[in-house]
């Protein structure tokens, strides 16, 4: 069954509120799409139907309560302005986004399931302001941080596969003293990679902490 079912349940249990669901629809016949439908072509009988999956789900949650828009300065708000012409032209206003997927480089293809920068770009622009921090708990090759950096946001990412460190460094063009320009804002960019010896245990540790929190919540 769809993993998003578990995701919604877990996020609600830990206190987040469900807000939206967006469908990312990939072009029909795209190379990264599974060809499950071919089974019926070989066996044209009932019970051999497996449709090709051409979409993925983006689920949006928020903290309880309303966002305090008054806390955002006029300057930050203006610098984070969304291009409404692009918003309309590319149909961001729909709950289904048609965006072509991308293939990871051959070097890293066995490690990651690539997604287009445009997908991250829309989400970062729609749900954060310049200067805020974007968190990606499944960093992969660093796409989220690359896009966030380009859009003037800070970014923190977690990745348990140490083999991807080289790819992350390569994509972020590590240079702690480089002076970059973000949407007309000059700032000192600092990129740091921290390696934890217990990284591979974090998944189990987090699950245990969540289960402990849920048991405590239910007992009360």
Show which residues each predicted segment covers.
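Core catalytic lobe of class I
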Residues: 1-167, 211-220
């Amino acid at each position: 069954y769809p993993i998003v079912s578990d995701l919604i349940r877990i996020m609600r249990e830990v206190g987040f509120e469900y807000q939206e669901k967006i469908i990312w629809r990939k072009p029909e016949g795209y190379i990264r799409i599974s060809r499950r439908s071919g089974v019926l072509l070989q066996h044209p009988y009932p019970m051999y139907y497996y449709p090709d999956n051409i979409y993925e789900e983006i689920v949006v949650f928020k903290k309880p309560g309303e966002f305090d828009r008054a806390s955002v300065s006029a300057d930050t708000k203006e610098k984070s302005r969304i291009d409404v012409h692009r918003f309309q032209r590319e149909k961001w206003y729909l709950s289904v986004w048609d965006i072509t997927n991308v293939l990871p480089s051959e070097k890293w293809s066995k490690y990651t399931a690539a997604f287009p920068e445009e997908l991250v770009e829309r989400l970062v622009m729609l749900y954060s302001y310049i200067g805020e921090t974007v968190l990606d708990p499944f960093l992969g090759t660093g796409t989220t941080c690359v896009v966030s950096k380009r859009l003037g946001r800070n970014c923190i990412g977690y990745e348990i596969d140490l083999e991807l460190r080289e790819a992350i460094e390569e994509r972020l063009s590590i240079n702690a003293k480089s002076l970059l320009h973000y949407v007309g804002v000059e700032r000192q960019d600092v990129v740091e990679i921290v390696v934890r010896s217990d990284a591979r245990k974090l998944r189990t540790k987090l699950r245990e902490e969540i289960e402990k929190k849920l048991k405590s919540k239910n007992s009360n």
